[in-house]
Amino acid sequence: MIEADRIISGQAKVDEDVIDRAIRPKLLADYVGQPQVREQMDIFIKAAKLRQDALDHLLIFGPPGLGKTTLANIVANEMGVNIRTTSGPVLEKAGDLAAMLTNLEPHDVLFIDEIHRLSPAIEEVLYPAMEDYQLDIMIGEGPAARSIKLDLPPFTLVGATTRAGSLTSPLRDRFGIVQRLEFYSVEDLTSIVARSAGCLNLELEQQAAFEVARRSRGTPRIANRLLRRVRDYADVRNGGIISINVAKQALSMLDVDDAGFDYLDRKLLSAVIERFDGGPVGLDNLAAAIGEERDTIEDVLEPYLIQQGFLQRTPRGRIATSQTYRHFGLQKLSD
């Protein structure tokens, strides 16, 4: 099973973009959660508008599904400018980036998702553009080739990444504002679910919103995805009304448990407990035991389990915590 196949994946799915745009907040006033980020961005945006400057270049990082793209669009809306969107893997040639930069209007936002995947050649074009609002272009080939400089309008580059550590230092250092998005509280996710239900004209009980939120792994994208699937269940089984019981039944059908775990999460934790006596167990042994690639365990499964205190990573291997035993209704044996 790959990450994109899981209903509790933080990665975006191809068919979700249209619906996500419909329920996505447009302004900071509608943006739920991330209070420190929201307060800081409110100050930075208002200051830039008072000075009639472009906002400083902004790097947003954090796990998938926490609202990096949403925040980039909010920045453009609050500044009253256009946003042009691309991604690191799409920008294969320097000319692709040059074309986007030369079409920007003053103070526009250029949003590059997965910015850690930019090639070195593209980064070289970005450096003078970010620092001096200039574009260095090579004209001609061979001995006759020469470099010319084009002036660019002041603009804001917003970069988004799930892997801030993979950015080169020269690129990272050129961002004047760096914001990290954290996992959301259940209370904030409940508000997000209720807001999304309103946008979709759903009849949703408050307790049902909480039930969806607490199984959403701290991630708005997962909360909204689960809400849509619960809506499907309610339309067929309960005349479209999403009660607490309907929400629980739908989520049970989807195999998402009270902790937001799916089959793969439970398979990993069960293997650590049952096959390796709670650990420590090495990554290769664990991968072989559950039939998954070690990269899948490290990049997809472990981060949330570790963050929530269900799995501990030690020099000797992975260990199931007391919380894991309680989740499965088991008693942890004393050392």
From Swiss-Prot:
Class of this enzyme: hydrolase
Gene Ontology molecular function, alphabetical: ATP binding; ATP hydrolysis activity; four-way junction DNA binding; four-way junction helicase activity
Superkingdom: Bacteria
Identification of the protein by name: Holliday junction branch migration complex subunit RuvB
Residues holding Mg(2+): T69
Domain notes: Has 3 domains, the large (RuvB-L) and small ATPase (RuvB-S) domains and the C-terminal head (RuvB-H) domain. The head domain binds DNA, while the ATPase domains jointly bind ATP, ADP or are empty depending on the state of the subunit in the translocation cycle. During a single DNA translocation step the structure of each domain remains the same, but their relative positions change.
Start and end residues of each stretch annotated as Large ATPase domain (RuvB-L): 4-184
GO cellular component labels: cytoplasm; Holliday junction resolvase complex
Provenance organism: Haemophilus influenzae (strain ATCC 51907 / DSM 11121 / KW20 / Rd)
Binding positions (ATP): I23, R24, G65, K68, T69, T70, E131, D132, Y133, R174, Y184, R221
Subunit text: Homohexamer. Forms an RuvA(8)-RuvB(12)-Holliday junction (HJ) complex. HJ DNA is sandwiched between 2 RuvA tetramers; dsDNA enters through RuvA and exits via RuvB. An RuvB hexamer assembles on each DNA strand where it exits the tetramer. Each RuvB hexamer is contacted by two RuvA subunits (via domain III) on 2 adjacent RuvB subunits; this complex drives branch migration. In the full resolvosome a probable DNA-RuvA(4)-RuvB(12)-RuvC(2) complex forms which resolves the HJ.
